[in-house]
């Protein structure tokens, strides 16, 4: 079907898909989507606002229609141009083997050097020069310093009594 001979009124009745198919048949090569849209707009004589309104539906229709194929990077062509075997090959990308990275063995040795060897008596003596006696341990167990506040503060603290000691939690004690 030759769309070039149609009047402007007949062209306005065509769908964007039909015009896209016609343009791709005439060019006989792939085309970027924005370029295809510009050619459709020029062919149909549509304003920018009109083409923007129909653009989303047009893109959806191109994806659903079996006559078009997206070749990646927003390139479109006609599916009839490609045999089925070639389509799968063009869509697949070649994977390149990953480069081997040099291992960071030096870092591991530094970490191992930082570890304390408890079999070496000199290092252990340096780490624990303070001797702890049994009296120190018993003192720590019996008396926690956190339990006692400095003088003067304990007397300033008020004791809060629990008003809910009777087990009735439904009513506020201040309302009684």
UniProtKB/Swiss-Prot annotation:
Pfam families: HARE-HTH (PF05066). Residues 105-119, 159-176 have a biased composition (Acidic residues). Residues 14-81 form the HTH HARE-type domain. GO terms for biological process: DNA-templated transcription; regulation of DNA-templated transcription. Signal peptide: none annotated. GO terms for molecular function: DNA-directed RNA polymerase activity. It comes from the Bacteria. Keywords: DNA-directed RNA polymerase, Nucleotidyltransferase, Transcription, Transferase. One of its GO terms (cellular component) is DNA-directed RNA polymerase complex. Residues 91-119, 140-176 are annotated as: Disordered. HAMAP family: RNApol_bact_RpoE (MF_00357). RNAP is composed of a core of 2 alpha, a beta and a beta' subunits. The core is associated with a delta subunit and one of several sigma factors. Belongs to the RpoE family. Participates in both the initiation and recycling phases of transcription. In the presence of the delta subunit, RNAP displays an increased specificity of transcription, a decreased affinity for nucleic acids, and an increased efficiency of RNA synthesis because of enhanced recycling. This is Probable DNA-directed RNA polymerase subunit delta. The gene is rpoE.
């Amino acid at each position: 079907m030759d769309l070039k001979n149609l009047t402007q009124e007949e062209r306005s009745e065509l769908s964007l898909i039909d015009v896209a198919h016609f343009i791709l048949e005439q060019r006989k090569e792939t085309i970027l989507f924005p370029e295809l849209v510009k050619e459709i707009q020029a062919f149909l004589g549509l304003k920018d606002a009109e083409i923007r309104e129909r653009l989303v539906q047009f893109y959806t229709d191109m994806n659903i229609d079996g006559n078009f194929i997206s070749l990646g990077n927003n390139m479109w062509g006609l599916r009839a141009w490609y045999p089925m075997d070639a389509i799968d090959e063009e869509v697949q990308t070649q994977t390149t083997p990953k480069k081997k990275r040099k291992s960071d063995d030096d870092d591991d040795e530094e970490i191992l050097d930082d570890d304390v060897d408890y079999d070496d008596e000199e290092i252990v003596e340096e780490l624990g020069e303070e001797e702890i006696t049994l009296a120190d341990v018993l003192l720590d167990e019996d008396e926690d310093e956190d339990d006692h506040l400095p003088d003067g503060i304990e007397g300033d603290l008020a004791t809060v009594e629990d008003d809910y000691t009777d087990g009735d939690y439904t009513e506020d004690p201040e309302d009684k």
